[in-house]
């Protein structure tokens, strides 16, 4: 299905002009949205609970308030707290202070789509979801371009929710390179599937299985690390720049031949069948409920998963090897640590 890409010239109405904007949260996405909007000439305040993020927002020159106070002052509110915290923040701080006729935005559809947050009918609901982490949203903006984004007009009480979403995307720099209109359902389900089946869950499981196959056959762990993890970036960068075509043009004929004949032996019809089961769990809300239940119970499952992952042999070997490869550290992780 073809989609339309919109750009700055397509944003005909300055829907944010003269509006008081409140960004809720000052983490990875929060600092980027707030700073980019301010640099685009908009009036931005920060709503965040007292702590490091509160202090950092003030240090960066923003008027900073507790969440409820910021919401009460604002015409347009963007919720950029972590998914698992949004429901309680909404119920305790946002909902009691939300004015009729205001607009409430999100950068991911999790809580709206799965029904954990229900917004009054007299409030606009929109989404702008940059397809990049916050430090890249900020950095690319300062460099004069931006990152692509998805946008949604979900609840159009004022008749201007779509214009607000598009103007927000323009204000943070995303409309410079292109924005695509979608729905909360599509963004949420596709995003979760991509993370789980390919980008995070699928990829780490594939790398770990490859590492174990080599080491169990007697090959050195250090060499296995280079073959299945370290060189991953080289291949992904080529695909990022020019798709499968550029990657295959850049590798040896031996590697390309092996790609064609062996890839389907690894990613079989059975794997695709499992992917469909993963998608079904996402669509039904099962994954969302499992995630929320674990959070409310104090994260026992997530904590156990993290501990097990930390003790993987590939992680221990990789940590030692990277000490001798400072070039693997881009510096972007420092920005992430600051704005968590």
From Swiss-Prot:
Entry note: cofactor: Binds 2 magnesium ions per subunit.
Binding site for Mg(2+) 1: 191, 195
Binding site for Mg(2+) 2: 191, 227, 231
Keyword Amino-acid biosynthesis: yes
Binding residues annotated for substrate, in chain numbering: 252
Result of changing residue 48 to L: Inversion of cofactor specificity from NADPH to NADH. Strong decrease of the affinity for NADPH and 2.5-fold increase of the affinity for NADH
Keyword terms of this UniProt record: Amino-acid biosynthesis, Branched-chain amino acid biosynthesis, Magnesium, Metal-binding, NADP, Oxidoreductase
Domain KARI C-terminal knotted: 183-328
Domain of life: Bacteria
GO MF terms, alphabetically ordered: ketol-acid reductoisomerase activity; magnesium ion binding; NADP binding
Pathway: Amino-acid biosynthesis; L-isoleucine biosynthesis; L-isoleucine from 2-oxobutanoate: step 2/4; Amino-acid biosynthesis; L-valine biosynthesis; L-valine from pyruvate: step 2/4
The UniProt record lists the keyword rRNA-binding: no
UniProt xrefs under HAMAP family: IlvC
Classification via NCBIfam families: ilvC (TIGR00465), PRK05479.1 (NF004017), PRK13403.1 (NF009940)
Task of the protein: Involved in the biosynthesis of branched-chain amino acids (BCAA). Catalyzes an alkyl-migration followed by a ketol-acid reduction of (S)-2-acetolactate (S2AL) to yield (R)-2,3-dihydroxy-isovalerate. In the isomerase reaction, S2AL is rearranged via a Mg-dependent methyl migration to produce 3-hydroxy-3-methyl-2-ketobutyrate (HMKB). In the reductase reaction, this 2-ketoacid undergoes a metal-dependent reduction by NADPH to yield (R)-2,3-dihydroxy-isovalerate.
Protein name, entry field: Ketol-acid reductoisomerase (NADP(+))
Organism: Lactococcus lactis subsp. lactis (strain IL1403)
Name of the gene this protein is made from: ilvC
